[in-house]
């Protein structure tokens, strides 16, 4: 080990220079030292010559001194993987931060991996049924696809993410990994407790300190962490997800927020002395994003489906950060404040959300035709809203009145009670089968349910429930 040790020569914020006597660690190797009694990991980013390497610190560098000894571990950052990570919270270097003792995984795996080769990748376009009507019908997710979740504050992003984890866990028996990149610590804490309350994860305090039986692993690098940790925590989460995929699982991988992954990369880039590119971002923006996104893919063994929350700076979609992630997305789920204001949850915008697999070749003729008819009806209603606002409903033709009535029913039928929101709403959550979703909306656009009041369609699961609710409303009115 003697020849593998070096010493710190310079500390500038999150960037630390280390000089070695003879041995020089490779780029991306993890170096270890101690700082105020804690293990500090440094990742090699550049070779400067004269046996000196420039590294990025994965934790605070306050307290480091020049001349301090540093050891080369001989490989990249290694994190525990496997079922031991489920129900636990880890940081970027795989240390537990939930005060339940260390995470002892089946194995350790390097956070930097090659993307699967062409021969390993699966080329089938297969739909991943989520049990959420609006998503399954109008912007279906594909197994192994990448979904961008666009939404402001308070429109239900976290609840939608929670419900997806819950539904996939129930319907597919699959595992989920949540990477909080530049997360608010409070939100991360809320998510952990919400998962226990909604039975996605097991409460260790009621299970002899064990989280066995949980369905979701959490990897956090919060806002207060140095940029090194925020730039790598998405890779740590992905490494945990890749292990489950290689075991033959269908994994759901959440990143909140992909913009902060880019932002952290930009902070580090400036400290490393790279010349910034457009809008001050790192020159390696597309490479960094590609290295992460190309690993999120379906292989012949299993699939990773990723849902990524994307913050758009100043609502400018042409900003280099969101633009770099757009190139990789297969589907976009847009959450709209105007829909949330109507009390329709999930507040997914049915006209703005898109999907690559909304094609008759993948989802079949019937599903495709019903989805297009639903969108046409909603689009027509949107076009008529100005006329209604100025002249009122009475000025519309009979045909347009019928379109408006159907569109309002469709709007309400796109709402659905969530399992994870049961504690707040008091109404039991619904998981709707794809065939039931198509059948319900097909009947709506064909006019089979024109006789039912629009309230009957609000916050129900299948069309049968809407008919039942309609009968109840009629009985109450009588």
Curated annotation (Swiss-Prot):
Keywords, comma-separated and alphabetical: ATP synthesis, ATP-binding, Cell inner membrane, Cell membrane, CF(1), Hydrogen ion transport, Ion transport, Membrane, Nucleotide-binding, Translocase, Transport
Topology in the lipid bilayer: Peripheral membrane protein
An annotated GO cellular component = plasma membrane
Gene3D superfamilies attached to this UniProt entry: 2.40.10.170, Bovine Mitochondrial F1-atpase, Atp Synthase Beta Chain, Chain D, domain 3, P-loop containing nucleotide triphosphate hydrolases
One Gene Ontology MF term = ATP binding
Its Enzyme Commission number(s) read 7.1.2.2
Q: Which residues bind ATP?
A: 151-158
NCBIfam families the record matches: atpD
Oligomeric state and partners? Answer: F-type ATPases have 2 components, CF(1) - the catalytic core - and CF(0) - the membrane proton channel. CF(1) has five subunits: alpha(3), beta(3), gamma(1), delta(1), epsilon(1). CF(0) has three main subunits: a(1), b(2) and c(9-12). The alpha and beta chains form an alternating ring which encloses part of the gamma chain. CF(1) is attached to CF(0) by a central stalk formed by the gamma and epsilon chains, while a peripheral stalk is formed by the delta and b chains.
What the record says about family reads: Belongs to the ATPase alpha/beta chains family.
List the protein's name.
ATP synthase subunit beta
Look up and give the organism this protein is from: Azorhizobium caulinodans (strain ATCC 43989 / DSM 5975 / JCM 20966 / LMG 6465 / NBRC 14845 / NCIMB 13405 / ORS 571)
